[in-house]
């Protein structure tokens, strides 16, 4: 029977993404969101790196003690006693000690022999255990380490007191069949020890390798929200969670909360989500080709691996030159507009003849229908309202601090600092005018906001 959980490393590995820095408050909020999501472990950072990381972990551990956060809290540490002491004084649940074990790392980085490395690993793990915490050892560059030596390293870590060893594919060179073979062999050769995989995504194989590691016996997968991390990052949390559910039937996190957590980290990291990103991208459940849309309208399983509602999403489709009559009729029915078959054919012909328009929005379709029918058409109220809120800040405040406060208001989709008469531009979405007014009032009530100007979005090209 497969047993697997998620260690989320957004606050440690994720912050190693170039250009990404989380404030203390952001670290705490992300940790709470990850706990609510249901990850098994939160790697909260490397406390010896900087005072803000230390303070962030301190506050996260406090929330853990209060029962607000339920995930196991992990502190990162070099194989250095002072690092271990700093992590231990924070009273984290587990200290994760890392050390490069490949011959390349031993020679180029540590300037140590294999024997010296084994002594360092044993001594530091034992030292951490003496502080009364659980210990994980990370075999950095484990995927390029001689297998027999990797077995010796794992046994040394186990015998010194570690109950977990993480195999790091540090430069992302593993491939699935090799990964399964590696973990199968390790779990066979080193009993009474559990293994993690820390898979980097340099070749785009991190998710596939994580699934293969599960098949080989790994019980914890390291992931980050949106796949953040050094260079091109590691396993994206939303992708591996969906894949584990689909292939193994195991729900390692609350899937319907992935969208919120992804958006939260997108805002705080400043790394935009590509629209075609799996699971949480704008296009993940958006269909285009006429044959596809017709299939989805009859039975969504034709072109969806799982229902979007599983992930707190909804399906939609675009209208353009690829559109068929099924999609167009469904769109007009949703708008509450009655169109005859002959009129529908004329509208569709106009759409297909205009090859330069990327998306036909609802307002475009209404204009086309009125042009063809000669009638003034009254659609149902829109399902959502989009607006742009221009914000002017008080002269004595730091604009970025206001931007951060605005970015976490419900309904706010994007926040941009701009030049000109206003300081910030906020993109918002609301289901109706009442909700829009509530969002606007929340923006106006934000500390540092002097005035606002609201513009409704009528059409997108």
From Swiss-Prot:
Annotated Pyruvate carboxyltransferase domain residues: 4-259
Active-site residues per Swiss-Prot or TrEMBL entry: 292
One BP term from GO: lysine biosynthetic process via aminoadipic acid
Keywords: Amino-acid biosynthesis, Lysine biosynthesis, Magnesium, Manganese, Metal-binding, Transferase
Keyword Metal-binding: yes
InterPro entries noted in UniProt: 2-IPM_HCS-like, AIPM/Hcit_synth_CS, Aldolase_TIM, Dimeric_a/b-barrel, Homocitrate_synth, LeuA/HCS_post-cat, PYR_CT, Tscrpt_reg_AsnC/Lrp_C
Known catalytic reactions: acetyl-CoA + 2-oxoglutarate + H2O = (2R)-homocitrate + CoA + H(+)
PROSITE patterns in the cross-refs: AIPM_HOMOCIT_SYNTH_2 (PS00816), PYR_CT (PS50991)
Chain residues that bind 2-oxoglutarate: 12, 76, 136, 170
One of the Pfam families matching this protein, by short name: AsnC_trans_reg
EC number: 2.3.3.14
Cofactor: Mg(2+); Mn(2+)
Tree of life domain: Archaea
Enzyme class: transferase
Record PANTHER family: HOMOCITRATE SYNTHASE, HOMOCITRATE SYNTHASE-RELATED
Family: Belongs to the alpha-IPM synthase/homocitrate synthase family. Homocitrate synthase LYS20/LYS21 subfamily.
Role description: Catalyzes the aldol-type condensation of 2-oxoglutarate with acetyl-CoA to yield homocitrate. Carries out the first step of the alpha-aminoadipate (AAA) lysine biosynthesis pathway.
Protein name (record): Homocitrate synthase
